[in-house]
Amino acid sequence: MPKRTDIQKIMVIGSGPIIIGQAAEFDYAGTQACLSLKEEGYEVVLVNSNPATIMTDKEIADKVYIEPITLEFVTRILRKEGPDALLPTLGGQTGLNMAMELSKNGILDELGVELLGTKLSAIDQAEDRDLFKQLMEELEQPIPESEIVNTVEEAVAFAATIGYPVIVRPAFTLGGTGGGMCANEKELREITENGLKLSPVTQCLIERSIAGFKEIEYEVMRDSADNALVVCNMENFDPVGIHTGDSIVFAPAQTMSDYENQMLRDASLSIIRALKIEGGCNVQLALDPNSFKYYVIEVNPRVSRSSALASKATGYPIAKLAAKIAVGLTLDEVINPVTGSTYAMFEPALDYVVAKIPRFPFDKFEKGERRLGTQMKATGEVMAIGRNIEESLLKACRSLEIGVHHNEIPELAAVSDDALIEKVVKAQDDRLFYVSEAIRRGYTPEEIAELTKIDIFYLDKLLHIFEIEQELGAHPQDLEVLKTAKLNGFSDRKIAELWGTTDDKVRQLRLENKIVPVYKMVDTCAAEFDSETPYFYSTYGWENESIRSDKESVLVLGSGPIRIGQGVEFDYATVHSVKAIQAAGYEAIIMNSNPETVSTDFSVSDKLYFEPLTFEDVMNVIDLEQPKGVIVQFGGQTAINLAEPLAKAGVTILGTQVADLDRAEDRDLFEQALKELDIPQPPGQTATNEEEAALAARKIGFPVLVRPSYVLGGRAMEIVENEEDLRSYMRTAVKASPDHPVLVDSYIVGQECEVDAISDGKNVLIPGIMEHIERAGVHSGDSMAVYPPQTLSQKVQETIADYTKRLAIGLHCLGMMNIQFVIKDEKVYVIEVNPRASRTVPFLSKVTNIPMAQVATKLILGQSLSELGYQNGLYPESTRVHIKAPVFSFTKLAKVDSLLGPEMKSTGEVMGSDATLEKALYKAFEASYLHLPTFGNVVFTIADDAKEEALNLARRFQNIGYGILATEGTAAFFASHGLQAQPVGKIGDDDKDIPSFVRKGRIQAIINTVGTKRTADEDGEQIRRSAIEHGVPLFTALDTANAMLKVLESRSFVTEAI
């Protein structure tokens, strides 16, 4: 069927900010879909609140609205644009829920907007647990016994009839939010209560637990002519019971018989046909390992995390084709862009194995609950491709960037047998490493399979890896054993360890004996047809398929998996850098390991290497491609950390040189540079042990800010008030980087701001200054940033511009740099300099219309700012006000404290733009799901050093009609200054404490600060947790509360008697 001509204008809803459960895979899907629709000649209107994505670039759609994805704003845009149709299946759960809301409020009918891709009835059938159950019964597809409940009592009654364990699944939530496994009534009551609150329709499904079954997923496509196919099947290494987003996954599935595969394939295709989905869909099934029994677990009637993985694993571009199907094209009319010759109706065939391992945030959240269950906790993931399980698994392990280069964590050797087995049975994020350690200790695959329900097939592979380790240990320098190890994915580093030599020597031995990897193409058809995709993975074998071209090339290193502190912003910069390299006439080569992102879409670069970002793997590509040089500025700390070893190996680093990177990152060299340039910084010293740190702090005076050098996202950074706290920090936190010292700085409480600058070595372009709303002490990634600055004097802005120019030229910066300043009493101090692209690049690029990463890349490749038409100095300000606000994923992470400080905790960001500060703030708060009603109750629980300031806020809240509640000490302070606040009880005073008020819905906002001492106040933590769990806006910085008040004041009317 040809494409539809009765629709011209299509609106696409994006997925909003990155949170756990909804990450960069939707940026990738949305970008593909918008371009795909434009290619077919439709006018595309995009709504998305996330500035950090490629998707919200001007070129991606005809009109891009970076506005909150709320009923109010989306309706406004629909009325203004009047599209013929809406495509909601590419914006994750956010997009689907928005479509449902628009429909239920009658907006779609009123404006005559048609839903494309998935009909509302199908969204309802897949997402509403009751309708889903009915549909499965009609199709005679087995599902676990279950009951829909709307109250806790109903749940308890049903569980009593089927017996424990049971699983709770809230309706219409993302990434299993609010769900979980319950072994008894107490757990069931707790989880159901929370799940009902988090479900927008207060509905949960209670079902019999089938934990221990194999979890299998099918990624399927269907078109309007009822053609349907399986793109890819995938098998979870972890059995049912752990969220698939937190599971290690292999594609294609490895342990099913042909009969089982056909059975589950038929089930998946019959489900997508029954739902009449036009586009992509993901079906999750549970298979009994001991019989042919299976159950359908759930269906996602949209593009999902698994479809991004399936696209990258097969090369089959699901989102791109889903968009074409949505406008009426059929699978037998669309050419598969990978081969360029076969139609999309061909099912992909794989002649390799793909492994995906999730990346968790627990290196940042040491207190977080690491046990895995049905609620997702990973922030990102890595993927690796190999010719066997061992190879793809070990490549994926070293892609994780958690300090491992093999499937082992050396520290586990010291763990007792009992502790080890407990971790093997009770899965945490690092279970793979515990299971591998158990095998090294002689536990058999059979014993471990019994304990974990992991298939023996995979455990045998882990045993095989261990056997190769033993072979290597017994035969140092043996070439045959070396070949075997390389065929099975071993790194040079691991081999060197077992041989008692260095990585370099192993590399030399390999090169002398021509033991080098070949690169194979990902072509969707197992090499049956000729293919034109330049998408490669390494393996040790025969016939290299990646042929070096005659054109000069430039290699760009990506940023690896998404984690807190290094998010999709770096992928954004990578993609823009590639565009500039191509525009300059070079061949652009990308190397990255993250399946969710736009940079690993094979159509972005001239060549894509899907490989771990380690020195060995990068050098292998360089040896083959011989590029003009490597760009490391855009891949965050991942790429910067590779600069020095690459330069030592004789590789040309393009842009700022390694010695100059060192001057910005090494404390003593940086201090010296600032002295020479006559730029003030807070007084500080370096310390390599506890005594030195104590001495330094006494000299500088408390409070001090302590942190390791060379880290990203404020890892292990703290503000300490006294020597005792400092000593305990030195004992517990300094593991962060053993061969780098700790920095001890005077902590200046002032106004913080940051600048991104671009330099060609002679001139410096400063696109803009961003002012932080929260004062110094809150990590820049967790602060709200305002552009242009609202409170900085002209003099301060001129000083900042002057210091920025001096630093860029003085540090020989070529390309991008980011500088953070703190201002106190009109004096400007430099806090830190990062000689690379930072996380503010996408935001600042969008609000100034300067494609910063592209400009920086052109300068790196030899052009000057004046040739590109840019002046030296500060770029003219925009007239609108733009705000970048952080978004957190605390609902997903039990036991993580939501108190903000110098260590970064946010997972994503949104942007609000308007003519005034108040309007822009309103949009930013709405987009980040912080909705405050115009009246209600606010509770204050404030540390002594901030009571004075809080009093002023409380008065303003009272003026606009809010009721004021406060904890005992705060209420007494308010009363002594003439403000009566209703006192609330201490934690544990039943019915009178803050958590119980929160549960009853009597509190609309909580303002909670702790002293600079920041001791773990358990009461405060419980209060903050209750706010997170019940979705009550929580402010742990008074500056943020002040910003929210500005919004409320601008929206409220004053009523006064005459």
From Swiss-Prot:
Residues 930-1058 are annotated as: Allosteric domain. Pfam families: CPSase_L_D2 (PF02786), CPSase_L_D3 (PF02787), MGS (PF02142). It comes from Streptococcus pneumoniae serotype 2 (strain D39 / NCTC 7466). Mn(2+) 3 binds at Q820, E832. Mn(2+) 2 binds at E298, N300. ATP 1 binds at R129, R169, G175, G176, R208, I210, E215, G241, I242, H243, Q284, E298. Pathway: Amino-acid biosynthesis; L-arginine biosynthesis; carbamoyl phosphate from bicarbonate: step 1/1; Pyrimidine metabolism; UMP biosynthesis via de novo pathway; (S)-dihydroorotate from bicarbonate: step 1/3. Residues 133-327, 671-861 form the ATP-grasp domain. CDD domains: MGS_CPS_II. The large subunit is composed of 2 ATP-grasp domains that are involved in binding the 2 ATP molecules needed for carbamoyl phosphate synthesis. The N-terminal ATP-grasp domain (referred to as the carboxyphosphate synthetic component) catalyzes the ATP-dependent phosphorylation of hydrogencarbonate to carboxyphosphate and the subsequent nucleophilic attack by ammonia to form a carbamate intermediate. This is Carbamoyl phosphate synthase large chain.
